[in-house]
């Protein structure tokens, strides 16, 4: 009860300019649920309370991982991957890299949804039908976005080191390698908002 009251009060203080920055700690998503708080986590609440397009961006010394979908059950992820969502999330990551990390021409990699990016439709059609054409449109307009890349080999081959940020299609696809590679030194930065 006190965790959520503290979080709500701190968010209010941030909105009112009483504090400059909000730093949060992990909270138990089950314990915070109530009639007045029905959000799966910090990012979702901050998205409602602050201006901008909130995005979970995991940050460590040499790795940044954003998510196209965050607290979405795995069996619903494919239905959430629309051209509009992909464009919005990539733009949010790009602007955060420019504004918050001083990277003028960021290179962004996007991971595929299905094993082996669908193997030409044999293991799912979302990578060919949605991700590839959307990424091409974004790239053709000048954003250095690449992919989709097969997620199973992307991190193990150190391919991630060539990019300023990686965007995973779903929560565990991005957070498992991030937490493994950051060795407990990473943080969840809520990008895309008018406040830090």
Predicted regions mapped to residue ranges:
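Anion-binding alpha/beta catalytic cores of soluble intermediary-metabolism enzymes, centered on
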Residues: 1-126, 131-196
